[in-house]
Amino acid sequence: MTRTAYVNGVYAPLRAAAVSIQDRGYQFGDAVYEVWAIRGGRLFDREAHFARLSRSLRELRIAEPMSGPALMAVIAETIRRNRVSDGIVYLQVSRGIAPRDHAFPSTLVRPCIVVTAKSLDRAILNERLATGVNIISLPETRWARRDIKSINLLANVLARQEAKEAGAFEAWFVDDDGFVTEGTSSNAWIVDASGRIRTRGLSNDILHGVTRAALLRIAHERQMQVIESPFTIAEALAAREAFISSAGNPAVAVIAIDDTPVCDGRPGPVTRALGAAYLGGAP
């Protein structure tokens, strides 16, 4: 089946879809993005992702490309045209097309929007949930506004490639004080030696993960002990469990860090319970 993309008001075959070479997203990374998981034909955490998109746009002073209902209609149509039941939707909004200049355009420009959707093999996620993943740790090298979901991801790309070359699935960044911030495309968690679920608190240091928020809500509803505080790699290795979360990988166990097993090297009960509750929940 030929995949279809939405670009600035037009649905086109993915291979033919294009943006201007003067698009500020292309030239400066002056753009934001969002990713929704689709499971069983449903968008998970739909409204929370829309809210984060709006926040990122406000932080960069980029205008909303269209109304919320209109944007939802575009997303739904993109999913329909690509016949996606299990997969992801990717949406990107740039400041628009303008002559190259680092400062914002002096005249009003229209934001550029791209929406794509693709199917993913659910069996791959199920296997990952069942077996867990290995990760590595690396020094934090990203900019200071990680709370904005910007397309500026070069440091993430380099770290993820280093993880891949090390035979790992993900990399956790570690700040100058020795605390884990997050992964290249996921939030970081542990269940510490006292049985408390821990994840770094919200600030400009990390992306305000939508799946992170959903898992915190589930944990509180189940009266699990939760604390939002940073932790070190040493604490993660001494923990009962460690895991990552993202739209595509909700509550996936980390079974080894830098080739050292976490606990017994298997997904733990808290991670499994949170993942099952999240995947069984409503969007």
Where are these regions (language model features)?
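Conserved alpha/beta cores of soluble small-molecule-handling proteins
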Residues: 1-172, 176-179, 207, 216-283
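Secondary-structure junction motif
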Residues: 211-212
